[in-house]
Curated annotation (Swiss-Prot):
Heme b b566 binds at H97, H196. The gene is MT-CYB. Component of the ubiquinol-cytochrome c reductase complex (complex III or cytochrome b-c1 complex) that is part of the mitochondrial respiratory chain. The b-c1 complex mediates electron transfer from ubiquinol to cytochrome c. Contributes to the generation of a proton gradient across the mitochondrial membrane that is then used for ATP synthesis. Heme b b562 binds at H83, H182. It holds the Pfam family Cytochrome_B. One of its GO terms (cellular component) is respiratory chain complex III. Its cofactor is heme b. InterPro entries: Cyt_b/b6_C, Cyt_b/b6_C_sf, Cyt_b/b6_N, Cytb/b6-like_sf, Cytochrome_b, Cytochrome_b_C_euk/bac, Cytochrome_b_N_euk/bac, Di-haem_cyt_TM. It comes from Alcelaphus lichtensteinii. It is a multi-pass membrane protein. This is Cytochrome b. Keywords: Electron transport, Heme, Iron, Membrane, Metal-binding, Mitochondrion, Mitochondrion inner membrane, Respiratory chain, Transmembrane, Transmembrane helix, Transport, Ubiquinone. GO terms for molecular function: metal ion binding; ubiquinol-cytochrome-c reductase activity. A ubiquinone binds at H201.
Amino acid sequence: MTNIRKTHPLMEIINNAFIDLPAPSNISSWWNFGSLLGICLILQILTGLFLAMHYTSDTMTAFSSVTHICRDVNYGWIIRYMHANGASMFFICLFLHVGRGLYYGSYAFLETWNVGVILLFATMATAFMGYVLPWGQMSFWGATVITNLLSAIPYIGTDLVEWIWGGFSVDKATLTRFFAFHFILPFIIAALAMVHLLFLHETGSNNPTGILSDADKIPFHPYYTIKDILGALLLILALMLLVLFAPDLLGDPDNYTPANPLNTPPHIKPEWYFLFAYAILRWIPNGLGGVLALALSILILVLVPLLHTSKQRSMMFRPISQCMFWILVADLLTLTWIGGQPVEHPYIIIGQLASLMYFLLILVLMPMASTIENNLLKW
């Protein structure tokens, strides 16, 4: 008799995706982040659901309701901090997952890669709207500054901003709709993640060498299930260390002050995972230019497959490209640091150089390095 997991219509889908899936025998720990992102998403949806049971999306009571969750709700404090720091873990996994894709040439799977870029955008939108919900000073001013960027769009900018706000300033209507979107988007992300997996399973996974691995495949279970469980345990360990020992390490003290439209904080800045994009935004003094640079800083990922000039897929055997990749990583860390600094000398010039370097590396230097390597290998 055939096993039920191979015959039952629902079980068959799960079986083909997580049990009998043929996987390359040599995929390293860098391939763990897909499953870790799935765990992060489930964790965020569950903690978010319990938070939503006690949260009120009204300007008068939002801040108080978050305080109430932390003080009065049973284990409310741990749910709140798991949700806030879970977002940080989510983005750490996201950045490492994208970095893995860039390094090993996983972007050659066009559909998978493009759905991944959409997922990145959706996750960033969700995180931004979530940051507004506690209605602290940084929530309010972050929402005001970031939504106001759209006013730089010619002709329709001002109307667009007021339409998003639901009025003439960030107010009750804005908070209510942000809560609604923040609640629905993770489910859209979950659906997109399934599409992401669907496209991936059409081609099969890439591997560190970038060479076709059809000749050497192993079943996903038990080899990669046990490997993913180890990754999950390490992720949960890191998250709980953060939640239980330094829950406010990555937050902003300003967000413990209730929102006040009459008092602007000295330094308005987003959460750490948006700082690199925020630095690129501030790089161009012109409003529209900054907004375009901000959008392009993420959209540029769509161009990466078109800019691939190497005859090899992975960077595993390409030392010059490896150098370029790690310079890009250092550049992004520099941008993250600059994004959190005030707009004054020497930070302005460092930010401008780092932003210029970011676009130069992806658009010019990395394709050039690949071409040089091709010539060195007489390809």
